[in-house]
Structure formats: structure tokens, C-alpha cells
UniProtKB/Swiss-Prot annotation:
Family: Belongs to the complex I 20 kDa subunit family.
Cofactor: [4Fe-4S] cluster
Record key words, sorted: 4Fe-4S, Cell inner membrane, Cell membrane, Iron, Iron-sulfur, Membrane, Metal-binding, NAD, Quinone, Translocase, Transport
Originating organism: Chlorobium phaeovibrioides (strain DSM 265 / 1930)
Record's subunit section: NDH-1 is composed of 14 different subunits. Subunits NuoB, C, D, E, F, and G constitute the peripheral sector of the complex.
Pfam families per record: Oxidored_q6
Main location: membrane
Keyword Manganese recorded: no
GO CC terms in record: plasma membrane; respiratory chain complex I
InterPro entries noted in UniProt: NADH_UbQ_OxRdtase-like_20kDa, NADH_UQ_OxRdtase_20Kd_su
Top enzyme class: translocase
Record GO terms (molecular function): 4 iron, 4 sulfur cluster binding; iron ion binding; NADH dehydrogenase (ubiquinone) activity; NADH:ubiquinone reductase (non-electrogenic) activity; quinone binding
Protein name: NADH-quinone oxidoreductase subunit B
Length: 189
């Protein structure tokens, strides 16, 4: 038993790592910038409406890239628009995340074969963290993608790179048991 154990057990003191506090603050206050380019933008607006209420998850939309930490690319990205997508992405402060919403921004959508003017996926110009499939995806699917971003933030840390966190998230989707056990260990520690 250490010197502080008695003092901590008698009072309401919470002991945790700085890493987990920072991640909790970041995942509890996502500020997405919507980049709506086509019909997926309508579903993105519906997700922000009172029926789904993204603010209950701590997600507050912003219109400036300098105030956001998440870019939601929703819709068809043309070759001319790709330069602007990159410029807005570069204006976002670190750490920044990208969610690709819908078939058009994921892979070119119905224009992938004959659309010479359409980018065949926004991941060709900026790194994408989470893909939300659908044409257009329902608001529930977008909320699911935002939850994946929050899980990614929870897994990141001072010693954990984003690539490692993405790998761990992919493994957790196939077998969630190790992730559940790790969360239990963190709660008891």
C-alpha cells in the first residue's frame, strides 16, 4: 500500500492517465465540417436535424476548416473540386480525421466507369479514416461511421499511431472480445 492510497480511497479522487483524458475530451467533442457535394448532403443534413440530433453525441457541426477536426466528404468529387478538398483538408488543425460518406466519395459511385470528370474515390487525394457505404447512406449509417471515428480516437494515444489504432479497430470488428477485455482492464486500473 502506497502513501497516497489511503488519502485517495477516503476522498472522491479520480486517477487516470493524461492520455485517456485527452482522448475522452477529443472523442466527446467532435467538430465536423460537412463537405456536401450531392444527394448524400441531404442525408447529412437530416442527421443534424432534431430527429437524430448529433449534438447528443457531442458532435457540433462547424463551417470553417480551421475550427473542425473531422471532414465529412459526402457526394461526388469531381476533378476540379479535388483541389478544393485538399486545400480544406490542409487548413484543418491536427489531429484531423476524414469520413467518406456514400458510394460517390468512396469509389466514384455510378460514374466510376464512364465519368472522366469524377474522382474515383476521395482517398486518392486525402487520407480517409472511415468509409460509410450507401447511395445515399441513411442517417443511421452516418451515425455508425461517426461512432467508428470516436472508437478510433479512443484507441489512439501518445504511443499509439493512427495506423495501429486503425488496425486494432479492424481486428475488433472481426473479434471484439480482446477489445472488451482491454476496456475492462482500463476501468479497473
Amino acid at each position: 500500500m502506497g502513501l497516497l492510497d489511503a488519502a485517495v480511497s477516503r476522498q472522491n479522487v479520480l486517477v487516470t492517465s493524461v492520455d485517456s483524458v485527452l482522448n475522452w475530451a477529443r472523442l466527446s467533442s467532435l467538430w465536423p465540417m460537412g463537405f456536401g457535394l450531392a444527394c448524400c448532403a441531404i442525408e447529412m443534413m437530416a442527421t443534424n436535424a432534431s430527429n437524430y440530433d448529433l449534438e447528443r453525441f457531442g458532435i457540433f457541426p462547424r463551417s470553417s476548416p480551421r475550427q473542425s477536426d473531422l471532414m465529412i466528404v459526402a457526394g461526388t468529387v469531381t476533378m476540379k473540386m479535388a483541389e478544393r478538398v485538399v486545400r480544406l483538408y490542409e487548413q484543418m488543425p491536427e489531429p484531423r480525421y476524414v469520413l467518406s460518406m456514400g458510394s460517390c466519395s468512396n469509389c466514384g459511385g455510378p460514374y466510376w466507369e464512364h465519368g472522366y470528370h469524377v474522382l474515383k474515390g476521395v482517398d486518392r487525394v486525402i487520407p480517409v479514416d472511415v468509409y460509410v457505404p450507401g447511395c445515399p447512406p441513411r442517417p443511421e449509417a452516418l451515425i455508425g461511421g461517426l461512432m467508428k471515428i470516436q472508437e478510433l480516437i479512443r484507441m489512439e494515444g501518445l504511443g499509439v499511431s493512427r495506423a495501429d489504432a486503425l488496425k486494432k479497430l479492424a481486428e475488433a470488428e472481426s473479434d471484439p472480445q480482446p477489445l472488451i477485455e482491454e476496456a475492462r482492464k482500463q476501468k479497473t486500473a
